[in-house]
């Protein structure tokens, strides 16, 4: 299981880079607001995460149901962490680091035992 987690973590690093690049392009090139930029970054990064983890981490097929389960869970997790951060007036960097840590662990457990539970 540690080997799987290491693969999942590697893809997570790429996800973070993708999210930040899309966010930056939206803010500085497309001149969107932060909410739109963050949403766009999330959608692109979480989609990459799903397909990359299905292929390289879990060696599983991709289905619409699996995609919806994964994106729905990660989106809910993201919104919840953001809501709590707003309620607690946390600085954005604290929110980012907190979400990164929580999503890494929770996303891995959810993927292994729910989304890709029947993968070999």
UniProtKB/Swiss-Prot annotation:
Q: What is this protein called?
A: Bactoprenol-linked glucose translocase
- Which family is this protein grouped under? Belongs to the GtrA family.
Q: What does this protein do?
A: Involved in O antigen modification. Involved in the translocation of bactoprenol-linked glucose across the cytoplasmic membrane.
The cross-references to PANTHER family, in alphabetical order and at most eight, read: PROPHAGE BACTOPRENOL-LINKED GLUCOSE TRANSLOCASE HOMOLOG
Q: Which Pfam families match?
A: GtrA_DPMS_TM
Cellular component terms (Gene Ontology):
host cell membrane; plasma membrane
Membrane topology (UniProt): Multi-pass membrane protein
* Gene of this entry: gtrA
Q: Whose protein is this, by species? A: Shigella phage SfX
GO-annotated biological processes: polysaccharide biosynthetic process
Look up the signal peptide feature and give its range: none
Highest taxon of the lineage = Viruses
* Sorted UniProt keywords: Host membrane, Membrane, Transmembrane, Transmembrane helix, Transport
Its localization reads: Host membrane
Transmembrane spans? 10-30, 34-54, 65-85, 90-110
Q: Does the keyword Transmembrane apply?
A: yes
């Amino acid at each position: 299981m540690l080997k799987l987690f290491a693969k999942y973590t590697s893809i997570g690093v790429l996800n973070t880079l993708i999210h930040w690049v899309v966010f930056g392009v939206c803010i500085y090139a497309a001149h969107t607001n932060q909410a739109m930029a963050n949403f766009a970054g999330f959608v692109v990064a979480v989609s990459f995460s799903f397909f990359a983890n299905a292929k390289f981490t879990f060696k599983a097929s991709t289905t619409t149901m699996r995609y919806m389960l994964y994106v729905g869970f990660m989106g809910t997790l993201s919104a919840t962490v953001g809501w709590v951060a707003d309620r607690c007036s946390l600085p954005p960097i604290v929110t980012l680091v907190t979400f990164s840590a929580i999503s890494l662990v929770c996303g891995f457990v959810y993927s292994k035992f729910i989304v890709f539970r029947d993968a070999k």
